[in-house]
Amino acid sequence: MEVAAKLKYARISAQKARLVADQVRGLGAEQAVNLLRFSNKKAAALMKKVLDSAIANAEHNEGADIDELKVSTVMVDEGPSARRFHARARGRANQILKRTCHITVKVSDSQVEND
């Protein structure tokens, strides 16, 4: 059984969020939560909320045992970018991109399903 949780339009660049995603991919759920709790990165706090939601979904909707859950998939996709302008000298302007991303976390129990 695989259960997912998503956070869309997170106000962080996908490149920065992927650094944290690579750390938790494949870990046990409890170990991943502990790693994210003590990380100093902004993406870690966002990823922890999504992981907690996925764990709660697995427990409530599927009746899964929390101790057997592991992080099977973590995807960070680019979202739309908001454009802002930064005033420069001599009447010019530069563009600033406020990037967003979509974070998807899937947790699964260690059992393999047979169809």
Swiss-Prot record:
Sorted UniProt keywords = Ribonucleoprotein, Ribosomal protein, RNA-binding, rRNA-binding
Q: Say yes or no: keyword RNA-binding present.
A: yes
Kindly give the CDD domains that the UniProt entry links to this protein: Ribosomal_L22 (cd00336)
The molecular function terms in GO held by this entry are: rRNA binding; structural constituent of ribosome
Can you list the GO cellular component terms from the UniProt entry? cytosolic large ribosomal subunit
- Whether RNA-binding counts among this entry's keywords is yes
- Cross-referenced InterPro entries: Ribosomal_uL22, Ribosomal_uL22_bac/chlpt-type, Ribosomal_uL22_bac/org-type, Ribosomal_uL22_CS, Ribosomal_uL22_sf
Q: Which GO terms describe its biological process?
A: translation
Against NCBIfam families, the record matches this protein to: rplV_bact
Q: How does it assemble?
A: Part of the 50S ribosomal subunit.
Q: What does this protein's UniProt record list under function?
A: This protein binds specifically to 23S rRNA; its binding is stimulated by other ribosomal proteins, e.g. L4, L17, and L20. It is important during the early stages of 50S assembly. It makes multiple contacts with different domains of the 23S rRNA in the assembled 50S subunit and ribosome.
**By its UniProt entry, which PANTHER family does this protein fall under?**
CHLOROPLAST 50S RIBOSOMAL PROTEIN L22-RELATED, LARGE RIBOSOMAL SUBUNIT PROTEIN UL22M
Protein family membership: Belongs to the universal ribosomal protein uL22 family.
In its UniProt entry, what is this protein called? Answer: Large ribosomal subunit protein uL22
- Organism annotation: Coxiella burnetii (strain RSA 493 / Nine Mile phase I)
Organismal lineage: Bacteria, Pseudomonadati, Pseudomonadota, Gammaproteobacteria, Legionellales
